[in-house]
Amino acid sequence: MLRRGSQALRRFSTGRVYFKNKLKLALIGQSLFGQEVYSHLRKEGHRVVGVFTVPDKDGKADPLALAAEKDGTPVFKLPKWRVKGKTIKEVAEAYRSVGAELNVLPFCTQFIPMDIIDSPKHGSIIYHPSILPRHRGASAINWTLIMGDKKAGFSVFWADDGLDTGPILLQRSCDVEPNDTVDALYNRFLFPEGIKAMVEAVQLIADGKAPRIPQPEEGATYEGIQKKENAEISWDQSAEVLHNWIRGHDKVPGAWTEINGQMVTFYGSTLLNSSVPPGEPLEIKGAKKPGLVTKNGLVLFGNDGKALTVRNLQFEDGKMIPASQYFSTGETSVVELTAEEVKVAETIKVIWAGILSNVPIIEDSTDFFKSGASSMDVARLVEEIRQKCGGLQLQNEDVYMATKFEGFIQKVVRKLRGEDQEVELVVDYISKEVNEIMVKMPYQCFINGQFTDADDGKTYDTINPTDGSTICKVSYASLADVDKAVAAAKDAFENGEWGRMNARERGRLMYRLADLLEENQEELATIEALDSGAVYTLALKTHIGMSVQTFRYFAGWCDKIQGSTIPINQARPNRNLTFTKKEPLGVCAIIIPWNYPLMMLAWKSAACLAAGNTLVLKPAQVTPLTALKFAELSVKAGFPKGVINIIPGSGGIAGQRLSEHPDIRKLGFTGSTPIGKQIMKSCAVSNLKKVSLELGGKSPLIIFNDCELDKAVRMGMGAVFFNKGENCIAAGRLFVEESIHDEFVTRVVEEIKKMKIGDPLDRSTDHGPQNHKAHLEKLLQYCETGVKEGATLVYGGRQVQRPGFFMEPTVFTDVEDYMYLAKEESFGPIMVISKFQNGDIDGVLQRANSTEYGLASGVFTRDINKAMYVSEKLEAGTVFINTYNKTDVAAPFGGVKQSGFGKDLGEEALNEYLKTKTVTLEY
């Protein structure tokens, strides 16, 4: 026998604890709160001899009735207790038959006659959600907030014949937070603490220790019940009073006003303490000043000139939307569920079926409220999901915001993934039916998880190089947009879910993103063909295919980034331990070129994200569309807001601001050497941010006479003409040994003549248009310079006579070392050939290395000793032997000399986005 104080205690195998002082209870009331009080009282050993509750509604029993029936407790479902002021005889007999010693009323909407109230030995106790004697009446919580009280709480009191006037048994209080709503206050304090207090009150009565403290009349107030008809907003008041009125009716009954002839209810009010953001005016009946629909919600104004923001709006038909979307006509992005999330959805479907017992099958289109659910069922749904879905805490408004099952599951999944539930992704698309599919292209800046116009509304045309037509207008990011994107990325890193996420979960999101890229590869490749002129078949395999591989590769690295332990000299007689940690840098900027729009994004951003950073990425001004489509897919994959930000626009404005921004800790750039130098300078002067640069190239390809000539011709052409020559590692100069030079040139020209130049969406096309008009003109000038300097134009050198920016594949021979063609990169389909004397290995190496560039290089020979010697001597970040363009996601890629420094791809790329911290401790 164990003893606690003076009470005898016995423990049984069921785990329930029984004290000596226990009571027989009648529970009178309803709701989830009533159910929880019932369950906790039974758990503490009290015997509930009867539950008196309301009748089933639309075939659904109240949660309290369900719990009691499951336990075998007698349940009485009474439509009323009295008629014409007198207790119904049958009801009184049923009540007295259970022999209760105490009535417990946790939440009761019915009038209980006094003879029932006074019948038990210990009378009756009632839970009331205010600090009595203040706010007597049925809408106590509402009035606590409406009146701007700084303290809220509840009272458990002894019932008498007055209206909430009985003696106090116990009270509890809490501070009212500035933006508390009725729901927030109830969920945070009144519900959980109220359950505990009811159980404590019953035990105090059982122990004979329950006080009866008369309520003072000083400070007593009584307010009437708040219903929809008297919850209309009166606008001639201060912002704080308006705020209190709105939150004091949130969620029930809901403060409302008239907008465009329709009743609109406001939810989620907060006082605006900062400057009023820009927005679109919205006329509101009775308001002296129009509201403003902003990206953060609907801004309202009091008569004192101060403002508040409302987060959500509900219309007469029950539909609820984020207030920021009042004028929006965009489409809502759909989250695609993982296998684990599908299981959660099935669990929730069972919960819906239990609540909507009158609905035979829960379908995607099933509407929670149109199927008969009430506000009480909302509380039950939220609580059951919390219990059965790993503690997931929804808010009541989540149900109102997504009343149909399919939409509700979307909201739940977003919540599970740690996304902001306040605003869903809305995408305004430019849609085109092309390549036998409907291509849907976002065209706005993507900042903090939302597509948005540029701050100043500026746009520019993005051009289809196949015919020179305008694809669409794209937002032209301003300095303000860059600053917003950086701020969003910083907040996501320092305060958001991303910064708290474990590495394996980060990898899961990246795997999911890779899957989505693969699932949408036809659309992405089509956009790449439209926007950059990439041949569709090549775009599928390389532009998109390698992007998928890159994200999968780095997703696997997420949980394998680790430091090391290092033996150091011990501080004897103590000991020391030194270890290193690899940590993310923070906010990273990424600026990518136009030749592989999505692949260049993937090469840099995958490593950046795997390391745990957040990013702001500026795509090339002429090819922004796949980057913006990528942003949409990142939301579908579940990336939290602010982790990925895409800002289309110019290098001179957006790119320069990124290089100068003090909150950016790393910048990764692929582009020209002159721009790379400017970026490096700006990064150094601003805050010495870490930089990795992949810049220009003039990659030499040496072809010896002992090579496999057929392969050398085929690979040599690929080295130059792959992706229209718009390839950073393209062979900028071919050195062909004298004895095979003429045959090599002849074969190359023969093969060029077989190439089909045309529409990149045509599956038989080999060679598409150059990326943009200015680049085509630069290539034509390059050829003119070569001819003027005396190089021999063997083939091509002209624009193709058809619409668009097409250029003939071009071959120059007799290129001497002093010529412009020998020194400068064309970045186009121009083969520059120089011959070298038979056997002069060191001489050709000297010529190959006499450039400031060092990105890639190649050699073709059957002699392995010669191949290895040449690979050692070539000054380049990559050397290809008897192959070319063979890059892989696991192999580091990057240049030397003025081709830059730092690596993309492979494990080494992770180090570009990590910092090493050394920790030493003594013990």
Swiss-Prot record:
Any one Pfam family match given in the protein's UniProt record, by short name: Formyl_trans_C
Keyword Nuclease assigned: no
EC number: 1.5.1.6
Family: In the N-terminal section; belongs to the GART family. In the C-terminal section; belongs to the aldehyde dehydrogenase family. ALDH1L subfamily.
Region (Aldehyde dehydrogenase domain) residue spans: 438-923
Residue ranges, annotated region (Hydrolase domain): 23-331
Modified residues annotated as N6-acetyllysine in this record: 903
Protein name per the record: Mitochondrial 10-formyltetrahydrofolate dehydrogenase
Location(s), subcellular: Mitochondrion
Species of origin: Homo sapiens
Keyword Aminoacyl-tRNA synthetase: no
Keywords carried by this UniProt record: Acetylation, Mitochondrion, NADP, One-carbon metabolism, Oxidoreductase, Phosphopantetheine, Phosphoprotein, Transit peptide
Signal peptide annotation: none
A single Gene Ontology CC term: mitochondrial matrix
Annotated ranges, domain Carrier: 339-416
Top-level enzyme category: oxidoreductase
One function term, GO molecular function aspect: aldehyde dehydrogenase (NAD+) activity
Active site: 128, 694, 728
Coiled-coil intervals: none
Annotated GO biological process: 10-formyltetrahydrofolate catabolic process; biosynthetic process; fatty acid beta-oxidation; folic acid metabolic process; NADPH regeneration; one-carbon metabolic process
Superkingdom classification of source: Eukaryota
Tissue and organ distribution: Highly expressed in pancreas, heart, brain and skeletal muscle.
Binding-site residues, (6R)-10-formyltetrahydrofolate: 110-112, 164
Domain-level remarks: The N-terminal hydrolase domain has an NADP-independent formyltetrahydrofolate hydrolase activity, releasing formate and tetrahydrofolate. The C-terminal aldehyde dehydrogenase domain has an NADP-dependent dehydrogenase activity. It catalyzes the oxidation of formate, released by the hydrolysis of formyltetrahydrofolate, into CO2.
